[in-house]
Swiss-Prot record:
SUPFAM superfamilies on file: Phosphoenolpyruvate/pyruvate domain
The gene coding this protein: ppcA
Listed GO MF terms: magnesium ion binding; phosphoenolpyruvate carboxylase activity
Name by which UniProt lists this protein: Phosphoenolpyruvate carboxylase
Species assigned in the record: Saccharolobus islandicus (strain Y.N.15.51 / Yellowstone #2)
Keyword Repeat tagged: no
Cofactor names: Mg(2+)
Catalytic activity line of the entry: oxaloacetate + phosphate = phosphoenolpyruvate + hydrogencarbonate
Subunit structure as annotated in this protein's UniProt entry: Homotetramer.
Described purpose of this protein according to its UniProt entry: Catalyzes the irreversible beta-carboxylation of phosphoenolpyruvate (PEP) to form oxaloacetate (OAA), a four-carbon dicarboxylic acid source for the tricarboxylic acid cycle.
Listed InterPro entries: PEP_COase_arc-type, Pyrv/PenolPyrv_kinase-like_dom
Keywords: Carbon dioxide fixation, Lyase, Magnesium
Family: Belongs to the PEPCase type 2 family.
UniProt-listed GO biological process terms: carbon fixation; oxaloacetate metabolic process; tricarboxylic acid cycle
Length: 511
């Protein structure tokens, strides 16, 4: 049996600090190849996700890794000891990137040939897994697996002319199959994940399956509590399915440093391991790696790698029904507020520092993320914008919990163990001055302000959260938030950008 990675380094652009080895503030090109090597060698991460989604991808990454760092990769075999996993664009969703999907798939046999030359015949398959984002049905992942088998691996048998086959020209094509990891990002698909996985299992018959649960995008689209509870439902469903099919399923969770995006940081990883029992692989995003002291980061990654994997909490039907009800109530409260803050979020997001060469951050084309009726930036910019205007998104929608009875509240607390801790961590950055300033700058309605105030009041009076600065860093952040809003109002944008960067350094994450 292969090693199932415990940690997966990603290229999420959530870091405030720029690593010393980067040639510029935007990490791209050769720097991303170097970053992959450093993730393995310096940080001890088991797996690197190589992202072809929403950006220009370098499909020669394996060639560059093996030729630039031969000593390391002779000792640590790519595909056996450490892993490289492609994240594809979803051709159903990202129409402009359909051919990037094809190009990335076509590059997999090239990596096989390179590894054969480097390691010897039959030693390893360096890239054998791909991640499909925004998966909503089993048909999508079945199509990806079959596309590779039929359109890539089997093309070596095509006859070109007069008995001459493709393999006579370019050699035989390996590997013959690839493993597809669905990345599930929307609420309904997370809560019905068993249908996606079981459908794939019945057709493809894999020996095991890795399933990637998003935690960041569902938080942006439906609210933090909806995201957490949807992941808990998904983990329970996957473990039930694993037992009923007698088939191993290894969940991955996509988590960032701030509470809204998962709260996996070098300072909070133990609580996240406790929160998401049953998860095999945790994403190590850029803020985790670059916004904390290196020794602390390396130690945290080592601890995650060596931690025990506990079984997921299996939910009874009545518990699952309660959690589903909470996610609906929460989303109904959360989304209208976000829709009314969308102009503010979009205006601030374009001023945040850029850390990766990502295409199309906003708009209906390509990479817009939509919550209800409006277009929003990507999740990192979304979170960074709300923190920067002094309204951490973790607080939005909280008062919907007032609709729960005592039994429902108990079920909620049992299934979101670190709820109060996550909320308190975020609430330190709440700025009371924001209301007047955002009303003035973006003409935010009295009704929206009143709803946020209800959420704030509920967090304070019912949950017992202390809002606002309680230490030097949080007080400084609140001050910077007011200065940012004032400079933005006066259109002194260079100063606005400076304050945004300073706040990100304090949070140890852009968003």
């Amino acid at each position: 049996m292969r090693i199932i990675p415990r940690t997966m380094s990603t290229q999420h652009p959530d870091n405030a600090k720029v690593p010393e080895w980067a040639k510029s503030e935007v990490i791209e090109g050769e720097d991303e190849v170097k970053e992959a090597f450093l993730a393995y060698s310096m940080y001890g991460v088991h797996e690197v996700m190589w992202d072809a989604e929403g950006k220009d991808v370098d499909t020669h990454v394996v060639r560059k890794l093996l030729s630039n760092y031969p000593d390391y990769f002779r000792e640590h075999i790519l595909g056996k000891d450490v892993f490289l996993t492609y994240r594809l664009p979803n051709p159903k969703v990202e129409g402009a990137d359909r051919k990037v999907f094809a190009e990335t798939m076509e590059s997999i046999p090239i990596t096989y040939d390179l590894a054969e030359k480097f390691y010897g015949n039959g030693i390893t398959v360096p890239v054998f897994e791909v991640i499909l984002p925004m998966t909503t049905s089993n048909l999508e992942i079945i199509s990806v697996a079959r596309y590779y088998e039929k359109a890539v691996a089997n093309e070596d048998e095509l006859e070109l002319y007069d008995g001459v086959k493709v393999k006579d020209l370019v050699g035989e094509i390996y590997p013959k199959v690839i493993e597809v990891i669905p990345l599930v990002e929307d609420r309904d698909s997370l809560q019905n994940i068993d249908n996606i996985v079981e459908g794939y299992y019945k057709v493809i018959k894999p020996k095991y399956m890795r399933v990637f649960l998003a935690r960041s995008d569902p938080a942006m689209n439906y609210g933090m509590i909806t995201a957490v509870l949807s992941v808990k439902i998904a983990l329970s469903e996957l473990y039930k399915l694993s037992e009923s099919l007698n088939f191993e399923i290894y969940p991955i969770i996509g988590v960032g440093s701030l509470p809204f995006r998962g709260h996996l940081s070098p300072e909070n990883y133990e609580k996240v391991l406790e929160e998401y029992k049953g998860v095999y692989t945790y994403t190590i995003q850029s803020a985790f790696k670059y916004d904390y002291d290196y020794d602390k980061v390396k130690s945290a990654i080592s601890s995650i790698n060596n931690s025990r994997i506990g079984p997921a909490k299996i939910l009874e039907k009545y518990e699952e029904d309660v959690l589903r009800k909470i996610t609906i109530l929460y989303t109904e409260r959360y989304q209208p507020i976000i829709e009314n803050l969308a102009n503010a979020i979009n205006d601030v997001s374009v001023l945040l520092p850029r850390r990766r060469a990502r295409k199309l951050h906003i708009g209906l084309f390509g990479y817009s993320r939509s919550a209800g009726k409006v277009s929003l930036p990507r999740a990192i910019s979304f979170v960074g914008s709300l923190y920067s205007i002094g309204i951490p998104p973790e607080l939005i929608g909280i008062s919907s919990l007032s609709n729960l009875d005592e039994k429902e509240w108990d079920i909620f607390k049992q299934n979101y163990v670190n709820f109060k801790h996550d909320l308190q961590t975020a609430a330190r950055f709440f700025n009371w001055e924001s209301f007047e300033l955002i009303k003035d700058i973006w003409k935010i309605s009295e009704d929206t302000i009143a709803k946020i105030k209800e959420d704030i009041d509920y967090a304070e009076s019912v949950i017992g959260i202390k809002l606002g600065g309680i230490d030097y860093d949080s007080r400084k952040h609140i001050l910077m938030s007011s200065l940012f809003l004032l400079s933005f109002k006066e259109k002194i944008l260079q100063e606005s950008k400076k304050y945004l960067y300073e706040m990100a350094l304090i949070r140890r994450s852009l968003g």
